[in-house]
Regions:
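Short hydrophobic/aromatic-enriched beta-strand-loop microsegments
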Residues: 33-41, 71-81, 122-129, 160-169, ...
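Active-site cofactor/substrate anionic-group-binding motifs, chiefly glycine-
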Residues: 41-84
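Active-site beta->alpha loop and helix N-cap motifs at the rims of alpha/beta catalytic domains
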Residues: 66, 71-98, 105-108, 112-117, ...
């Protein structure tokens, strides 16, 4: 019996559902019931009927699923899978900011630990961060933990005083302006789609900026060639 058959058999026996992030291997995505970005999978986690949620992703995703559906058992296939950025803010920093600003809302990116979420006022994803921040009554916004997404949001809501944390995604910041310029020279007619976790030096060249699912939709709906700059292989795929 193949591994795939074993997984499907156990899934049925245990009354489990498998959620997989776009970032996991293709083989894992093929046995998953739902594949998507953090926002989509968070919504799915609140609606599934199965007793067990198997979350193929990093730790904060499993934590989020448990927070949203506390009566379900949530299992992580790889307990060591983690997002470094999720730990790049502290409760001490949040408490310090609350002392400095009376009219403050702490906006926590979903890519963060459960502890950080408990000290925040609202949790957002890259899909809805701008909309939520824009509609908050607070003038001062402490955006954690990703400074690049926070900076992107700040530009969309100039009426807010967005205070940035120093966190970042190691993978996204590994994509540099030089890499973009070099690739654009090679493929001058191509479009560039980028995630807002990239640096502003990269985002200024982007034809589209959005969440993982947004980028996929953009690729599907666009007829022109698209640049995909990959790290660490650093090559362009058309």
């Amino acid at each position: 019996m193949s591994v795939t058959s074993d997984i499907l058999k156990l899934k049925k026996e245990k009354n489990a559902v498998i959620l997989a992030h776009y970032y996991v291997d293709e083989d894992v995505q093929e046995v998953a019931d739902y594949v998507g970005d953090s926002f989509y999978l968070s919504k799915v986690a609140t609606k599934v009927d199965q007793d067990i949620i198997v979350f193929a992703g990093v730790e904060f995703m499993g934590e989020s699923a448990k927070i949203l559906n506390p009566k379900k058992k949530v299992l992580m296939p790889e307990p060591g899978a983690d997002c470094p950025m999720a730990h790049m803010a502290t409760k001490e920093e949040i408490l310090k900011m609350r002392e400095q600003y009376d009219d403050l809302a702490v906006v926590c990116y979903i890519n963060s630990t459960a502890e950080l979420k408990t000290y925040s006022d609202v949790c957002v994803t890259s899909s809805n961060a701008v909309k939520i921040v824009k509609n908050l009554p607070n003038k001062n916004i402490f955006f954690i933990p990703d400074q690049n997404l926070g900076r992107f949001v700040a530009k969309q809501v100039p009426e807010k005083n967005v205070i940035l944390n120093k966190g970042f995604c190691p993978r996204h910041v590994a994509i540099t302006e030089d890499m973009v310029v070099e690739t654009k020279k090679k493929y001058p007619q191509a479009k560039l789609a980028a995630h807002p976790e990239c640096t502003e030096e990269v985002l200024k060249y982007a034809d589209y900026i959005g969440s993982t699912s947004g980028i996929i939709d953009y690729v599907v709906d666009t007829d022109l060639s698209l640049i995909h700059i990959s790290e660490p292989t650093r090559h362009a795929q058309i």
